[in-house]
A protein has these predicted regions:
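Generic structural "secondary-structure junction" signal
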Residues: 16-17, 40, 138-143
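Residue-level signal for inorganic ion chemistry
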Residues: 5, 37, 155
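C-terminal cap of metal-dependent C-N hydrolases
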Residues: 108-159
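Conserved beta-strand segments that form the floor/walls of ligand-binding pockets within enzyme
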Residues: 4, 33, 152
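Long hydrophobic segments that form regular secondary structure
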Residues: 1-13
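His/Asp/Glu-enriched, well-ordered alpha-helical/loop segment
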Residues: 18-123
């Protein structure tokens, strides 16, 4: 049995006084799952945790001081929105050795329907302008409870 890392970016920043080297962990093929630690952050949203993972990786890469760009930051530490989404879904399943996070026979069907047309939704996706990656970024950045129109957990619709 192996080990894995449960990573809550905001909690890590608050309590470890540092940003977790996520890019390096991924490059070493470590099992990392993204989590939302309510006691360590303001929102219990996995979308918010994914946005934090991307934001923190960009801060690590760009640096936090006023030195000239090539004298600050940690090169190649960026994590993409696609990677953050993977960490929030299948990465968590791999870390916990659970069959979750991907749509595949034998895996639990856990899913959300994000509706950009519902009242209160802040998600705006334009078929003629947004690529699939653009749409994913918008979902991660802008999804709040009003945009979630349906929820399935272990194959059972609960909303």
């Amino acid at each position: 049995m192996g080990a894995g890392i449960a990573h809550c970016p905001l909690s890590n920043m608050y309590f470890a006084d540092a940003a977790f080297p996520l890019r390096e962990a991924l490059d070493q093929d470590l099992h990392v799952g993204l989590g939302s630690d309510l006691s360590g952050g303001p929102l219990p949203s996995i979308f918010h945790a994914a946005l934090d993972a991307v934001s923190h990786s960009r801060v690590r890469e760009a640096g936090t001081n006023t030195h000239i760009m090539d004298q600050r930051g940690e090169a190649n530490s960026r994590v993409s929105f696609v990677e953050a989404f993977w960490l929030a879904t299948h990465g968590g399943g791999l870390t916990l050795d659970l069959p979750v996070g991907i749509f595949k026979p034998g895996y639990y069907f856990d899913a959300l329907v994000i509706d950009s047309n519902t009242a209160g939704s802040q998600v705006r996706i334009y078929d003629d302008l947004d690529s699939a990656q653009d749409a994913l970024e918008k979902i991660i950045v802008h999804t709040t409870e009003p945009a979630i129109s349906a929820v399935w957990v272990s194959g059972k619709q609960i909303k």
